[in-house]
């Protein structure tokens, strides 16, 4: 009886995966969480393999007979020669920090709207970017990705708040009457704020508390796929060299690399690069490894192509890829040292939680946390704290979590 129940549950689970869509999510979340789960073939191959092993362990399926080795074709040989030379030795367990939740943080509840992003400034203060009363739903954009609600004007409230790292109390705020549909926030080592607005189809660089951008990429309210346009950009990563990367985003599914002055240097992917992205939702840099790690959301993976900061050597090589059956749709990534932290979002019946990833060995080396709709994350400059935001439909579900990295 227990065996039959086990098989039935597996069948139901697979059926649920295939039929899942964002329509099952709460109102106000569906569009931002994506139009549905993209069925990635490699992901489901791994799921099928996992189920087959479980059935074999329980005696419900015969073990497969080993296949005879086939000679390599010329194409196979070329592919092997082009593989990466990453160090596949996993990091020592003692060197991997473990996120530990800080209970009762913040000490006072905030009345944020959807908290789409968090960053940490050079002083160690967490900074949140929220939508106030705005929600992204089916009435926000038309089929050409044009923002429907321009006539309502920008959000009148402060959209950016600087919090106290110890208590979570609001220290200061700004960003009123500037943004229409906030999405991404990054703060560089000089304290500059890098912001994306999906309604405006633009990315900005600001000095703190300034209402005039130092740099603007994209055309205001004009989505497009040319080198001068963006379409619902999601995230920005900034190198110490001043070069920066924009994840562009919901429509174009590409990464754009610029020099410090805003001149386009590179598009990822580009021929002959063998890489396909589907909603790059967040990005983070591991400069010492010369890697740009991407939350490739609808492909249910984290991919880390060469950033090309040290040299152009290695650009276009196959990206390090982390994709396992329990990873699901990846919404946020952040990094410190050799480690990438990630959070997934609602994906069928998979747990929604945090992941610790070693990009060099392309493995998940830890799980932590429990969430409902996480959207963004950031690590403090000194690596002592990790913050995760969630978006929801009320003040209780729109919030920020703090973890210490022990």
UniProtKB/Swiss-Prot annotation:
GO cellular component: extracellular region
Pfam families registered for this protein in UniProt: NHL
CDD domains the record matches: NHL_PAL_like
Residues in the signal sequence: 1-19
Disulfide pairings: 231-251, 293-304
Subcellular location as annotated: Secreted
Keywords annotated in UniProt: Disulfide bond, Glycoprotein, Lyase, Metal-binding, Repeat, Secreted, Signal, Zinc
Gene Ontology molecular function, alphabetical: metal ion binding; peptidylamidoglycolate lyase activity
PTM (free text): N-glycosylated.
Needed cofactors: Zn(2+)
InterPro entries from the UniProt entry: 6-blade_b-propeller_TolB-like, NHL_repeat
Enzyme Commission code(s) on record: 4.3.2.5
NHL repeats: 168-209, 218-261, 264-308, 358-402
Tissue/organ expression: Only found in a subset of neurons distributed throughout all levels of the central nervous system (CNS). Present in at least some neuroendocrine cells. In adult brains, it is only present in a small handful of cells, the majority of which being distributed in distal parts of the medulla, with a higher expression in the posterior surface of the brain (at protein level).
Reactions performed catalytically: a [peptide]-C-terminal (2S)-2-hydroxyglycine = a [peptide]-C-terminal amide + glyoxylate
Family membership: Belongs to the peptidyl-alpha-hydroxyglycine alpha-amidating lyase family.
Function according to Swiss-Prot or TrEMBL: Peptidyl-alpha-hydroxylglycine alpha-amidating lyase that catalyzes an essential reaction in C-terminal alpha-amidation of peptides. Mediates the dismutation of the unstable peptidyl(2-hydroxyglycine) intermediate to glyoxylate and the corresponding desglycine peptide amide. C-terminal amidation of peptides such as neuropeptides is essential for full biological activity.
Name this polypeptide is given: Peptidyl-alpha-hydroxyglycine alpha-amidating lyase 2
Taxonomic source organism: Drosophila melanogaster
Encoding gene per record: Pal2
């Amino acid at each position: 009886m227990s065996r039959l129940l086990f098989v039935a549950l597996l069948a139901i689970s697979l059926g649920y995966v295939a039929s899942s869509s964002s329509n099952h999510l709460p109102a106000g979340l569906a569009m931002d969480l994506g139009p549905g789960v993209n069925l990635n073939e490699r992901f489901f191959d791994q799921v099928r393999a996992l189920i087959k092993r479980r059935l074999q362990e329980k005696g419900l399926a015969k073990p497969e007979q080993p296949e005879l080795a086939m000679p390599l074709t010329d194409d196979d040989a070329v592919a092997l020669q082009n593989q990466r030379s990453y160090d596949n030795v996993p990091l020592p367990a003692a060197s991997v920090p473990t996120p530990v939740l800080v209970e009762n943080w913040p000490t006072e509840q905030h009345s944020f709207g959807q908290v789409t992003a968090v960053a940490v400034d050079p002083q160690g203060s967490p900074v949140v970017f929220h939508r106030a009363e705005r929600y992204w739903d089916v009435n926000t954009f038309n089929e050409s990705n044009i923002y429907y609600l321009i006539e309502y004007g920008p959000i009148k409230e402060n959209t950016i708040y600087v919090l106290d790292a110890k208590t979570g109390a609001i220290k200061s705020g700004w960003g009123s009457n500037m943004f229409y549909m906030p999405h991404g926030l990054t703060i560089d080592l000089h304290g500059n704020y890098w912001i994306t607005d999906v309604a405006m189809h633009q990315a900005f660089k600001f000095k703190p508390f300034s209402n005039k951008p130092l740099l603007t990429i994209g055309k205001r309210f004009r989505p497009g796929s040319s080198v001068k346009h963006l379409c619902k950009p999601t995230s920005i990563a900034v190198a110490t060299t001043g070069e920066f990367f924009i994840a562009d985003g919901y429509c174009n599914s590409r990464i754009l690399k610029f020099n410090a002055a805003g001149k386009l240097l590179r598009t990822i992917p580009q021929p002959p690069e063998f890489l396909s992205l589907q909603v790059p939702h967040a990005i983070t840099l591991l400069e010492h490894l010369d890697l740009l790690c991407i939350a490739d959301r609808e492909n249910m993976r984290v991919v880390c192509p060469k950033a090309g900061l040290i040299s152009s050597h290695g650009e276009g090589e196959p990206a390090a890829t982390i994709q396992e059956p329990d990873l699901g749709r990846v919404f946020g990534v952040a990094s410190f040292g050799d480690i990438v932290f990630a959070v997934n979002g609602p994906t069928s019946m998979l747990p929604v939680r945090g992941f610790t990833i070693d990009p060099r060995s392309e493995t998940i080396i830890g799980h932590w946390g429990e969430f409902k709709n996480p959207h963004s994350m950031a690590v403090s400059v000194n690596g002592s704290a990790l913050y995760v935001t969630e978006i929801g439909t009320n003040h209780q579900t729109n919030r920020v979590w703090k973890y210490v990295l022990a």
